[in-house]
């Protein structure tokens, strides 16, 4: 990328990382409110059975995440990072809105959980496709001496999403009764992400394209050494995501298994997310100097 295209403004940088953060926020809200969502869409089971069905529905989103990465990643290499990010973010907004508006099991019966599974599949596909182009955009937009810092912002905003989701959950659990949370409170938490989607799309439409080569350019096959490095990088990233999934499950375990008040379990998530927001950029900054 030319030197002038490296001069990414703060609003443009915020548009990339904020979009990623918003997508993780809504993805995680579903897990944070799994107990309440289970009561809405799987009411015919006991509390444990309802929770397990909800967690299974949550897990469905992870099935399509690799597919989203495999499809959108190469597509972004050909048509550009910006179109790929716009498509993924629009699809994410559509799937979130679908989840918010899906009627309960009491209203439309078995169609309700079927719709939830469908929207979760779309949500997972969009999130899986978003991460690659957004991370590549940050790498291509950064100068060599700031590349680690720029890319670390991608992961810092994921932690910010956990922090924000925890704060929203803490606020709603303090203001609403358990029944209100199950009836409509979780929809409010998820709808907050939908409200920001139009503004984020506008910001992303104004982003410069960072992909230099033309779509018809042939891509060389990666060498064996490059594939080995990529393999170990994937393992490292997979290990790092364990912390994110632990924080996602922390609220469910605390409320359902330990019997802790929801506000306390959300508070633990807030603390963990705050640490991630602070230390991810520090790690990126250090990597630029090693």
What are these regions (language model features)?
Residues 170-174, 194-212:
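C-terminal membrane-cytosol helix-exit motif in multi-pass small-molecule transporters
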Residues 126, 148-173, 196:
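Glycine-rich segments within core transmembrane alpha-helices of 12-TM secondary carriers
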Residues 108-128:
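Hydrophobic core of transmembrane alpha-helices in multi-pass small-molecule transporters
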Residues 30-31, 226-276:
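Extracytoplasmic gate region of multi-pass secondary transporters
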Residues 67-81, 280-290:
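Helix-to-loop junctions at the C-terminal end of transmembrane segments
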Residues 34-67, 85:
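Extracellular/periplasmic helix-loop-helix junction of adjacent transmembrane segments
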Residues 43, 90-109:
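C-terminal ends and interior cores of transmembrane alpha-helices
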């Amino acid at each position: 990328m030319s030197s002038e295209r490296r001069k990414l403004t703060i609003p443009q940088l915020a548009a990339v990382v904020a979009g990623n953060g918003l997508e993780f926020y809504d993805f995680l809200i579903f897990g944070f409110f799994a107990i309440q969502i289970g009561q809405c869409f799987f009411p015919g089971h006991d509390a444990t059975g309802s929770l397990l069905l909800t967690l299974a529905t949550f897990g469905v989103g992870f099935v399509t995440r690799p597919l989203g990465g495999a499809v959108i990643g190469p597509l972004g290499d050909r048509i550009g990072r910006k179109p790929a990010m716009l498509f993924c973010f629009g699809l994410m907004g559509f799937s979130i809105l679908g989840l918010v508006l899906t009627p309960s099991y009491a209203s439309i019966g078995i169609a309700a959980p079927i719709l939830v599974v469908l929207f979760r599949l779309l949500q997972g596909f969009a999130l899986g496709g978003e991460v690659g182009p957004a991370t590549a955009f940050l790498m291509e937009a950064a100068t060599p001496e700031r590349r680690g810092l720029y890319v670390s912002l991608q992961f810092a905003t994921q932690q910010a999403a956990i922090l924000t989701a925890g704060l929203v959950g803490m606020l709603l659990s303090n203001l609403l009764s358990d029944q209100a949370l199950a009836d409509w409170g979780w929809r409010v938490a998820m709808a907050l992400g939908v409200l920001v989607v139009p503004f984020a799309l506008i910001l992303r439409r104004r982003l410069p394209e960072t992909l230099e080569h033309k779509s018809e350019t042939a891509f060389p096959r990666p060498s064996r050494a490059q594939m080995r490095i990529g393999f170990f990088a994937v393992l490292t990233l997979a290990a790092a995501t364990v912390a994110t999934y632990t924080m996602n499950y922390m609220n469910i375990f605390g409320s359902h298994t330990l019997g802790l008040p929801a506000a306390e379990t959300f508070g633990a998530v807030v603390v963990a997310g705050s640490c991630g927001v602070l230390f991810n950029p520090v790690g990126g900054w250090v990597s630029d100097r090693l």
